[in-house]
Design a protein with these regions (language model features):
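Core SAM-dependent methyltransferase catalytic element
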Residues: 195-231
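Class I SAM-dependent methyltransferase SAM/SAH-binding core
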Residues: 49-51, 55-99
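Short alpha-helix
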Residues: 164-180
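Conserved beta-strand signature within the Rossmann-like core of class I S-adenosyl-L-methionine
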Residues: 138-145
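Short, glycine-/aromatic-enriched active-site segment of Class I SAM-dependent methyltransferases
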Residues: 146-163
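Conserved class I S-adenosyl-L-methionine
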Residues: 1-44, 149
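A short glycine-rich, Lys/Arg-flanked "PGG" loop and its adjoining helix->strand segment in the class I
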Residues: 125-137
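A short acidic, Gly/Pro-enriched loop at the edge of an enzyme's catalytic core
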Residues: 98-110
């Protein structure tokens, strides 16, 4: 097993694939609520990039059911294999998200839940900058981030070693704005909306949920209206 962060994360998600699927299918999470915010802000049949798709549920499934054309990535080949078995119509790409390449302005939207905090935070700016460049004008990015200001966190997840890295809320917001995102909505919520059992791996954790728009768009108000924001 590799001792670099990406290797730690890949190894863990390869080996917990069945447990992880059962967990995401049963866990209380705001993720579907925020995915719908993305869909509501985009045109019909949008092109969407999902980073950290896991086995394809629930987010990839929701996006496809709503008519989106999705390119989905996960670092774990096992997770991608599981997603392919369920959703062969999606374009699924295994590997490190930092190695992805797309033409500028390829996607109407992007979505990434429980994923970006597995990157060393020294790589987060470059990754967010790439996502910004891949979005079309008026593109919308919905994501969540951790809120603990720690360069390296090593722990266990379903019995396997795991790596996390994060800025705090102010640091996350500043970084997104510096890259060129307008932050339309920012919420800091307890994992599972505070309804998790004590034995849940996310019990007691907080996450920052963000709806962001590629900056300097003349239609910002239209996006905000569709999301029910700024009223």
């Amino acid at each position: 097993m590799s001792d670099v962060p990406e290797g730690i994360v890949e190894y863990a998600y390869d080996h917990i694939s069945e447990w992880y699927l059962q967990w995401v299918e049963s866990q209380n999470s705001p993720r579907e609520r925020y995915a719908r915010k993305l869909l509501e802000a985009l045109p019909p049949s949008p092109s969407i990039l999902e980073l950290g798709c896991g086995p394809g549920v629930p987010i990839l499934q929701l996006l496809l059911d709503q008519g989106a054309r999705v390119v989905a990535n996960d670092i774990s080949r096992k997770q991608i294999e599981m997603a392919k078995a369920r959703f062969p119509q999606a374009e699924l790409v295994a590997g490190d998200m930092t190695a992805l390449t797309f033409e500028p302005e390829s996607f109407h939207g992007a979505i990434s839940f429980y994923t970006l905090f597995h990157l060393p935070r020294s790589k987060l700016r470059d990754m967010l900058t790439k996502i910004h460049s891949w979005l079309k004008p008026n593109g919308v990015f919905v994501l969540n981030l951790a809120v603990v200001d720690e360069e390296e966190i090593h722990g266990e997840f379903f019995g396997y070693g795991m790596f996390w890295s994060s800025y705090d809320v102010d640091g996350n917001q500043a970084l997104l704005r510096e890259i060129g995102f307008d932050l339309l909505q920012v919420d800091v919520l307890q994992a599972g909306d505070g309804k998790l059992e004590e034995d849940d791996p996310d019990f007691g954790a907080e996450f920052m949920w963000v709806v962001a728009r590629k900056k300097d768009s003349p239609t910002k108000r239209n996006v905000e209206t569709m999301l029910g924001l700024g009223e």
